[in-house]
A protein has these predicted regions:
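DNA-dependent DNA polymerase catalytic subunits
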Residues: 1-242
Length: 242
């Protein structure tokens, strides 16, 4: 009621005055209330999160998260991490920093047990011909997911697996995952279509620590910086001498 009867008419009056001042043909600016939220975090232009209580005039029984430009709603983030980032944001909105520390620690343990298919980055693969190199598999400056795709295709040929696994083609939807340095292929990444071929024998070389950092902690970093929180307890002099 306050928005409809007080705030919106005042804003419309100001817009009319602005249109008149700037000699506009007509005032085309219209403001309507979108949400009422009790908490919000803005980290950059068009990147924010709100704890919504009222959505376009509908009072919600339980608060709802509204996310804009956040990794939790981006398809380039693994699904399991998107869900957990949303959980973490709910903790940030309604609980204490120690509760976030527990969520991160618990998810880290779970993450380390997940298969490659659950924690890999989804991407679209383009420009395979552009970055292919007959002598070195790929050229310098190749995007990491394309690099992984070219390594995958090379190994499929080398191991004679063409009849079992399709080669990655231009425009295919793929996943890529980081590998530890000491792996049989000698490259730090591998891409694949739906399942990482067991014949590659790379499961023990998946770099879970890097994947956790890149898929979960890094997307959370700008949110935590905005509220001055950390993702794990920090050692302090007070605690050391206490």
């Amino acid at each position: 009621k306050v928005c409809d009867n007080k705030i919106e008419p005042y804003i419309e009056k100001c817009f009319d005055e602005l249109a008149d001042y700037s000699n506009a043909f007509k005032n085309a600016m219209v403001m309507k209330r979108e949400v009422i939220a009790n908490k919000g975090i803005w980290v950059a232009k068009k990147r924010y999160m709100l704890n919504v209580l009222d959505d376009e005039g509908v009072r919600l029984a339980d608060p709802k998260l509204k996310l804009m430009g956040i990794e939790a709603v981006k398809s380039s983030t693994p699904q399991v991490c998107r869900g957990k980032i949303k959980e973490a944001i709910k903790v940030i909105m309604g609980k204490e920093e120690k509760d976030l520390h527990k969520l991160v620690a618990d998810f880290r343990k779970e993450f380390m047990t997940l298969p490659a298919e659950s924690i890999a980055f989804p991407r679209s693969c383009n420009n395979l011909k552009k970055y292919r190199d007959s002598a070195n598999i790929f050229i310098k400056g190749t995007p990491i997911h394309v690099k992984g795709a070219l390594v995958y295709n090379y190994q499929i040929h080398r191991l004679g697996l063409q009849s079992k696994y399709p080669l990655i083609q231009e425009g295919d939807k793929i996943k890529f995952i980081k590998l530890k340095a000491a792996n049989p292929f000698k490259f730090d990444v591998i891409s694949y279509m739906t399942t990482l071929p067991e014949e590659f024998k790379l499961q023990e070389y998946i770099d879970y620590d890097i994947q956790f950092q890149k898929t979960f902690l890094d997307p959370m970093r700008f949110i935590l910086d905005a509220v001055n929180w950390k993702d794990e307890p920090q050692a302090t002099l007070e605690a050391f001498f206490g």
